[in-house]
Swiss-Prot record:
Signal peptide: none annotated. This is Alanine--tRNA ligase. GO terms for biological process: alanyl-tRNA aminoacylation. GO terms for cellular component: cytoplasm. Belongs to the class-II aminoacyl-tRNA synthetase family. NCBIfam families: alaS. Its main location: cytoplasm. Its cofactor is Zn(2+). Binds 1 zinc ion per subunit. Consists of three domains; the N-terminal catalytic domain, the editing domain and the C-terminal C-Ala domain. The editing domain removes incorrectly charged amino acids, while the C-Ala domain, along with tRNA(Ala), serves as a bridge to cooperatively bring together the editing and aminoacylation centers thus stimulating deacylation of misacylated tRNAs. SMART domains: tRNA_SAD. One of its GO terms (molecular function) is alanine-tRNA ligase activity. Zn(2+) binds at H563, H567, C665, H669.
């Protein structure tokens, strides 16, 4: 039996013998092509040659190309792991001719390699050819069919439609008819019972396409028209993993030596055996596939991120983590540990894996740990929303809730949809998109500020007295009107102020300007051109009056607690993690603090606990504030003061000291550390390579955090009837819920079966079409099952239409047979139009569609409208 390495090498040797130049794989991540993020086919690196933009270097080439298909037309992500042959990253064995040979040689050599070199059984092979497209003036590919007739009987040469046999890289670009080679790997008994010709392109896991020969002769323009390419091109692609499956006598790509070494390591980590549990097997296949994609993307320079190609890689990584978390009990980072076995299986062919091993492991580990935190929060929130949705008798999650999970908690929409599908639900994507659009509009509006001219009342500069005073007398020096977010506001500069203007990460003070019987709200204080600017919602009646400028003392003290805590936190982090820790940024508000610092790995729970303990000791020591204003910077540095990231310092600085913590700082601070009360870390994450972020609360915020945890535990205990072992009680409850869910699903399945039998028994025929319908009360989910059962079991031309009343709601449903769809009928369009009769809307796919509405009296009319659109009675 040939190994994967031997198969890859044999392909290259064969085409080298046919005078092809063997070229290395292009990077999987595409640079410089606005139409592509990833290499999704072997021809991508030759696109400019095919279009005639650059001269060919060789007339014939062959290679093994790393490819990634997860977005756009070639979106295979949801199938990966659930079947035996779909992948995100895969290798494409390919040979090309640029204006040299064409169909005859391509077909001859494909046959020679498969049958004479690899010894595949020709009786198991089928070829498809393009049937033509009258709409585009394209005839059947009789030339290719004629060449295939030299090797295959006519019943092994099949016509294929435009979807299967006219290859296009995308909405625009090179394209042309193609000829697919399929192999039937079923047993002799199965082949005798059902011809392989009937299984081609029917998604049978053992009757699969292994090679696609594309006869590229057109370029698809942006307007959809076709133009001839400068020279005819042969572009072939053979799925390496599928070929290995066929040659190694396996029933799944994942059973070959391409994946099995990785799967065995995953199974060992999970303490299970591959092949013993369906859902665990799916999870292991997902992880084995995705680790390859992620590793190769990183070697090609694409790190996970929240934008474009980086987001795709992050999605794939998070999907794998989610499967490991849910089905293999992988609650800690584990995927980075798969790098050694991946290198063992693919390092020889792709040495870049070996060179980048340390980077790949580090990036994957950090991403895993970050997402595990997000996952726990997101799943918990989504579970709650699903329960609320089901309790309301609905199966569609509010799109705003899905957007909140995405926007606020970083929970990917595709994972939300996956979890919903597993629970028989879906998300309102239209509503989600609307929420996304509104957010973009808000961001645009927030960025636009219109400012008027300054009106000067007095000359002078503003003096800050807020280190010593919470309020003072003040007069307005100047003011101006601004317009922000369609609101009219005013900026005021005072001659002296206790208001701290936002700087150094500390937010600005809020408070009031008070004069006689008037109290003006100061909603923020910013620094513009080194001026403390007070933002107010309205101008005082008398702008020349003398005011009492008074800050919100409670919020100021909360800010001071958090700011002083960042100094103690900084010192504690250096003590626990090492002196390489340096502040890279901070954010201090009354509610919480954020502290960014240099560190090259996740701060562990144990390290966080040590940091909290150290900060707690410094708080309880009640160190007094030692403040040195206007100290020469050289003297401050001699004292051990640390200069902080992003700050500019003059010749004289302010030094803030608590015990052994000494920093240069212009912010406001508490008189003694004891006022902080306590500090609790509520989050730790990576914000950039080598930069970590800690989020924490202090004082009252820390108390509220602890109370919330206690309340949660009490609530859970109450829900679990105060069982002594909460975790065990919850586990039991989950198991019971799972059993109940299964019983409900069994009931719906059984009910669907009975309902289907009743509907089929009452079927009629109209214009040669079998007509099945239902109007009345029923469970919408059960009826959907009925629709798909009918499609699976009905070979004749048919239409199934249902008008369903379920829990005071009405649903219109339509399922069409394949032949009706090929004739041009589209269930989604028909249902969308008919839904007007029930005052609703909806749509769907060409085969199946649904619409919801509120006018139950119009159901029968809607059903009639559907039948009329189909052309039946």
């Amino acid at each position: 039996m040939l190994t994967a390495k031997e198969i890859r090498e044999s392909f290259k040797q064969f085409f080298a013998s046919k005078e092809h130049q063997i070229v290395p794989s292009a990077p999987m991540v595409v640079k410089g092509d606005p139409t592509l993020m990833f290499t999704n086919a072997g021809m991508n690196q030759f696109k400019d040659i095919i279009l005639g933009n650059v001269p060919r270097k060789y007339p014939r080439v062959a290679d093994s190309q790393k490819c990634l298909r997860v977005s756009g037309k070639h979106n295979d992500l949801e199938e990966v792991g659930h079947d035996t042959y779909h992948h995100t990253m895969f290798e494409m064995l390919g040979n090309w001719s640029f204006g040299d040979y064409f169909k005859k040689e391509a077909i001859n050599w494909a046959w020679e390699y498969l049958v004479e070199v690899l010894k595949l059984n020709p009786e198991r092979l089928y070829a498809t050819v393009f049937e033509g497209s009258p709409a585009e003036g394209l005839d059947r590919d009789n030339e290719a069919a004629g060449y295939w007739e030299q090797y295959l009987p006519k019943d092994h040469i099949l016509n294929g439609n435009k979807h299967d046999n006219f290859w296009e890289m995308g909405d625009t670009g090179p394209c042309g008819p193609c000829s697919e080679i399929h192999i039937d790997l079923r047993s002799d008994e199965e082949r005798a019972a059902v011809s392989g010709a009937d299984m081609v392109n029917k998604d049978h896991p053992q009757v699969i396409e292994i090679w696609n020969l594309v006869f590229m002769q057109f370029n698809r323009k942006a307007d959809g028209s076709l133009e001839p390419l400068p020279a005819k091109v042969i572009d072939t692609g053979m799925g390496f993993e599928r070929l290995c499956m066929a040659l190694q006598g396996k029933t799944s790509n994942y059973d070959t030596d391409v994946f099995q070494p990785i799967i065995k390591v995953i199974a060992g980590m999970a303490g299970t055996t591959y092949g013993t549990d369906k859902q665990q097997d799916i999870a292991m296949r997902v992880i084995a596939d995705h680790i390859r994609t992620i590793a190769f993307a990183i070697t090609d320079g694409q790190l996970p991120s929240n934008a474009k190609a980086g987001y795709v890689i992050r999605r794939i990584l998070r999907r794998a983590v989610r499967y490991g978390y849910t089905f293999l009990d992988r609650k800690e980072a584990f995927m980075y540990k798969l790098l050694p076995v991946l290198i063992e299986t693919m390092g020889d062919a792709y040495p870049e894996l070996i060179a980048q091993k340390t980077l790949i492991e580090k990036v994957i580990k950090e991403e895993e740990e970050s997402f595990l935190r997000t996952l726990e929060t997101g799943i918990r929130l989504l579970d709650k929303k699903m329960e609320e949705t089901k309790a309301a008798g609905k199966t569609v999650l509010n799109g705003v809730d899905a957007f909140t999970l995405y926007d606020t908690y970083g929970f990917p929409l595709d994972l939300t949809e996956l979890i919903l599908r597993e629970n028989g639900m879906e998300a309102d994507i239209e509503e989600f998109n609307k929420a996304m659009q509104k957010q973009k509009e808000r961001a645009r509006n927030a960025a636009a500020i219109e400012t008027g001219d300054w009106i000067t009342l007095k000359d002078g500069e503003c003096k800050f007295v807020g280190y010593d005073l919470f309020e003072c007398e003040a007069e307005i020096l100047r003011y101006r009107q601004i317009k922000q977010k369609n609101k009219v506001l005013y900026q005021i500069v005072l001659d002296q102020t206790p208001f701290y203007a936002e700087m150094g990460g500390q937010v600005g003070d809020t408070g009031w300007l008070i004069a006689d019987d008037e109290k003006i709200d100061v909603i923020d204080t910013k620094r513009e051109n080194n001026l403390p600017v007070h933002l107010v919602t309205k101008l005082p009646k008398d702008v020349t009056a003398t005011f009492t400028a008074k800050i919100n003392v409670k919020k100021r003290i909360q800010c001071e607690c958090n700011h002083s805590a960042t100094h103690l936190l900084h010192e504690a982090l250096r003590e626990v993690l090492g002196t390489h820790v340096e502040q890279k940024g901070s954010y201090v508000s009354p509610d919480s603090l954020r502290f960014d610092f240099s560190h090259f790995q996740k701060v562990t729970d144990e390290e966080i606990r040590k940091v909290e303990i150290l900060v707690g000791e410094k708080i309880r020591a009640n160190f007094p504030l030692e403040e040195h204003r206007n100290m020469p910077i050289a003297e401050a540095k001699a004292l051990g003061a640390m200069a902080l990231f992003g700050e500019k310092y003059g010749d004289e600085v302010r030094v803030v000291k608590y015990g052994s913590s000494v920093e240069l700082c212009g912010g406001t601070h508490i008189p003694a550390t004891g006022m902080i009360g306590s500090l609790r870390v509520i989050g730790e994450s990576s914000i950039a390579a080598g930069v970590r972020r800690i989020e924490a609360v202090t004082a009252e915020g820390a108390e509220q955090f602890v109370y919330a945890q206690q309340d949660l535990i009490r609530e859970l205990r109450a829900l679990m009837n105060h069982m002594p072992n909460l975790a065990q009680a919850m586990k039991k409850s989950i198991e019971e819920n799972a059993e109940m869910k299964k019983q409900i699903e069994d009931y719906i399945r059984e009910k669907s079966m009975r309902l289907k039998e009743e509907i089929v028994a009452k079927a009629s025929e109209s214009n040669g079409i079998k007509v099945m319908q239902f109007v009345g009360k029923a469970n919408a989910d059960a009826m959907k099952n009925v629709a798909f059962q009918i499609k699976a079991e009905t070979t004749d031309s048919f239409v199934f239409v249902a008008g369903i009343i379920d829990d005071n709601k009405c649903t219109l449903m339509l399922m069409l047979s394949d032949d009706l769809v090929k004739e041009g009928l589209h269930a989604g369009k028909i249902v969308k139009e008919a839904a007007k009769h029930i005052q609703g809307g909806g749509g769907g796919q060409p085969h199946f569609a649904t619409a919801g509405g509120k006018n139950m009296e119009g159901l029968s009319i809607a059903v009639g409208a559907v039948k009329e659109a189909v052309g039946v009675q």
